């Protein structure tokens, strides 16, 4: 009995000092639970641990960052559709996240402390960003740099300085141009290219919608082909060029206050809402800046605007291959401005009124006498009404000086009363009555040969 007690005591002491882990049945391969990713240190450790084999690191909390983090090439950082990475007040870095791997379901907030929320960098980078919010970058939400490629799906941008996305060469880079694929361009997603002339970026819009392009301060801007983006570019300081990617409907008057060249590329602006009652701007397009050029463009007032184009007080404006149609009054109104018109077309303007093409006047608060210079071919369905000088605003004595017929197809005569007579010098006049060919008399019916019965 004593020996048995001693043996049991020894076994108990061994159990205390040499404890053996106990696993539930079937848990022979169980591992310790991963630490939650809720601090910058934990995030960096999780990304490093995932890098060799790849995989997904999922945030467990909002994280404030003091320095940038890098997502490795074969890793996806996921925000669980809930969490945000935010630059701290003393953040030190040009970007918040360097993405050589993928991002999904996360918000990256530069908080005005970094130039970019996300950077995709290098020719080997081919990154997909899915449902990522990029906001409050001093320059842009996203920069795609040094020949990198990025694909955006369901991404949004807010509060960024110059554009949603920047495509850049990067310092001392002379290789491939950056590539960007987006599922769609919205009015909130503008793309700015800061690249050399030899490395033009590649932009692909997957839904196939047209793209509006422009030049602002020497950089190319890609935007949604919409009324809002066209209006924004026409009134952005530093804008010099705009090219339409497709037709645009206008629900508001389009004002042009910057010296831009707008190339319609054969497309049309159509007014879809009655704007005739808009004070001072009841016209489809109103040009108020010197040096504006409109080309290869149809402006369709659609009987919803007084004029298709109104040039107000601006100098050295050019309309080249512009078609002005369906204005309630004339196609183009020139108020105290100087305009050169080349190869113009006017149709269906003025309705039943004695109007149809170009009207010259002064308008409100304008002292200068208007002047139009005509070049090339002027086409109009009301050629006799293609030029009209408002002698209530322009003295009849000055009417002739308001029209310079430089190289056009028109013969223009301005009367002492300011009335204008127009004839197309290339038109063939109707022949005089005595020159018109007479209608030949009908020939008598042929008689049959009595011998053969055959008609001659």
Map each language-model feature to its residues:
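Surface-exposed loop/turn motifs in large extracellular/passenger domains
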Residues: 72-76, 93-107, 119-131, 144-159, ...
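Gram-positive cell-envelope targeting signals
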Residues: 1-25, 46, 59, 142, ...
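Intrinsically disordered, low-complexity repeat and linker tracts
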Residues: 1, 13, 22-33, 199-218, ...
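N-terminal extracellular ligand-recognition/capping segment immediately after the signal peptide
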Residues: 40-41, 56-75, 80-88, 240-260, ...
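Acidic Gly/Asp/Thr-rich repetitive segments characteristic of extracellular carbohydrate-active
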Residues: 30-58, 64, 211-245
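Charge-rich, solvent-exposed alpha-helical interaction surfaces
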Residues: 42, 46, 181, 204, ...
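Generic short beta-strand segments
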Residues: 60-63, 107, 245-248, 298-300, ...
């Amino acid at each position: 009995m004593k020996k048995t007690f001693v043996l049991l005591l020894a076994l108990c002491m061994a159990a205390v000092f040499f404890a053996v882990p106990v696993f539930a049945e079937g848990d022979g391969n169980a591992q310790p639970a991963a630490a939650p990713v809720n601090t910058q240190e934990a995030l960096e450790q999780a990304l490093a641990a995932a890098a060799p084999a790849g995989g997904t690191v999922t945030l467990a909390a909002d994280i404030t960052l003091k320095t940038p983090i890098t997502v490795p090439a074969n890793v996806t950082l996921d925000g669980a559709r809930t969490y945000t990475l935010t630059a701290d007040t003393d953040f030190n870095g040009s970007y918040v996240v360097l993405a050589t791997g993928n991002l999904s379901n996360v918000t990256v907030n530069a908080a005005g402390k970094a130039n970019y929320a996300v950077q995709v960098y290098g020719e080997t980078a081919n990154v997909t960003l899915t449902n990522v919010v990029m906001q409050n970058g001093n320059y842009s939400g996203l920069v795609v740099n040094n020949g990198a490629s990025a694909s955006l799906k369901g991404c949004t941008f807010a509060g960024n300085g110059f554009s949603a996305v920047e495509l850049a060469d990067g310092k001392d880079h002379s290789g491939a141009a950056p590539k960007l694929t987006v599922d769609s361009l919205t009015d909130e997603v503008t793309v700015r290219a800061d690249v050399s002339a030899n490395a033009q970026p590649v932009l692909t819009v997957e839904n196939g919608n047209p793209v509006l392009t422009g030049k602002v301060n020497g950089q190319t801007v890609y935007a949604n082909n919409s009324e809002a983006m066209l209006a924004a570019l026409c009134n952005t300081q530093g804008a010099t060029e705009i090219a339409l990617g497709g037709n645009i409907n206008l629900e508001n008057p389009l004002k042009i206050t910057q010296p831009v060249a707008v190339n319609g590329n054969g497309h049309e602006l159509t007014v879809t809402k009655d704007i005739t009652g808009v004070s001072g701007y009841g016209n489809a397009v109103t040009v108020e800046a010197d040096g504006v050029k409109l080309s290869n463009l149809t402006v369709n007032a659609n009987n919803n605007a007084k004029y298709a184009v109104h040039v107000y007080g601006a100098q050295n404006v050019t309309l080249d291959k512009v078609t002005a149609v369906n204005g309630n009054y004339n196609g183009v109104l020139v108020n105290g401005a100087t305009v050169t018109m080349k190869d113009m077309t006017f149709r269906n303007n003025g309705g039943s009124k004695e109007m149809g093409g170009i009207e010259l006047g002064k308008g409100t608060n304008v002292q200068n006498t208007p002047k139009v210079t005509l070049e090339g071919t002027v086409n109009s369905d009301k050629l006799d009404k293609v030029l009209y000088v408002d002698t209530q605003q322009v003295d009849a004595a000055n009417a002739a000086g308001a029209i310079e017929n430089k190289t056009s197809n028109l013969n223009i005569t301005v009367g002492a009363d300011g009335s204008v007579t127009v004839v197309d010098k290339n038109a063939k006049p109707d022949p005089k009555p005595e020159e018109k060919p007479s209608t030949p008399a009908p020939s008598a019916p042929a008689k049959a040969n009595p011998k053969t019965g055959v008609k001659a």
